[in-house]
Swiss-Prot record:
Gene Ontology MF terms: flavin adenine dinucleotide binding; FMN binding; NAD binding; NADH:ubiquinone reductase (non-electrogenic) activity; NADP binding; NADPH dehydrogenase (quinone) activity
GO CC term, one of those recorded: membrane
Cofactor binding comment, as recorded: Binds 1 FMN per monomer.
Keywords: Flavoprotein, FMN, NAD, NADP, Nucleotide-binding, Oxidoreductase
The EC number(s) this enzyme carries: 1.6.5.2
Organism whose genome encodes this protein: Trichlorobacter lovleyi (strain ATCC BAA-1151 / DSM 17278 / SZ) (Geobacter lovleyi)
Residues reported in the UniProt entry to bind NAD(+): 12
Reactions catalysed: a quinone + NADH + H(+) = a quinol + NAD(+); a quinone + NADPH + H(+) = a quinol + NADP(+)
Residues at which FMN binds: 10-15, 83-85, 118-124, 139
Protein name: NAD(P)H dehydrogenase (quinone)
Cofactors (names): FMN
Length: 204
């Protein structure tokens, strides 16, 4: 059984919704399991409530918290993060910055790594967030997998949609009111399945 972790940070639920779709894609591939994990929050409960994020986060409060030690158990890790000024969220960066010991031991070398993201706007940094994230995965010796154009939904032109060859993305809107579209969720499911198929071959 190939073990695939989906490690994410979500403030308002957009990335959590995408993570569930990615997990569905993983589980559609025989011999592969999906485990959802969320990185620790850095923002106080008081501030989360002020920003209106506390209620949104309650919907996925049951998902276990990721630990650095747990990452080594996976055959592949698919990371999900919102964009913060063209980069990953601080919560994800903080978590990854604690993986020095794992890097030293080569614990992630040869494992598959993949990334999905969300932005507020159509050109809000979805691609730079993913490609800059790849630097960390390469330092860990991971094998990066994206979303090839065999996923025809990447070519959709009749609606505004996230998604790129670097990974699935969703557009949240400036006020966060837009939820992931079916096209975006389908690309996320494809990414999960694509990673699972490659991981299954590597671990056979």
């Amino acid at each position: 059984m190939s073990k695939i972790q989906i490690v994410f940070y979500s403030m308002y639920g957009h990335i959590h919704t995408m993570a569930e779709a990615v997990a569905d894609g993983v589980r559609s591939v025989g011999g592969c399991s999906a485990e959802l994990l969320q990185v620790p929050e850095l923002i106080s409960e008081e501030v989360l409530e002020k920003y209106g994020a506390k209620a949104a986060r309650a919907a996925f409060a049951h998902i276990p918290t990721a630990t650095v030690e747990r990452l080594a158990e996976a055959d592949a890790i698919i990371f999900g993060t919102p964009t913060r000024f063209g980069n990953m969220a601080a919560q994800m960066r903080n978590f990854l910055d604690q993986t020095g010991k794992l890097w030293l031991s080569g614990g992630l070398v040869g494992k598959v790594g993949s990334v999905f993201a969300s932005t507020a706007t159509q050109h809000g940094g979805q691609e730079t967030t993913i490609t800059s994230f790849h630097s960390t995965l390469l330092h860990h010796g991971m094998i990066i997998v994206g979303v090839p154009y065999t996923e025809q939904r990447l070519l959709t032109m009749d609606e505004i949609s996230g998604g790129s060859p670097y990974g699935a993305t969703t557009l949240a809107g400036g006020d966060g009111s837009r939820r992931p579209s079916e096209n975006e969720l389908a690309i996320a499911r494809f990414q999960g399945a694509h990673v699972a198929k490659i991981t299954a071959r590597l671990t056979a």
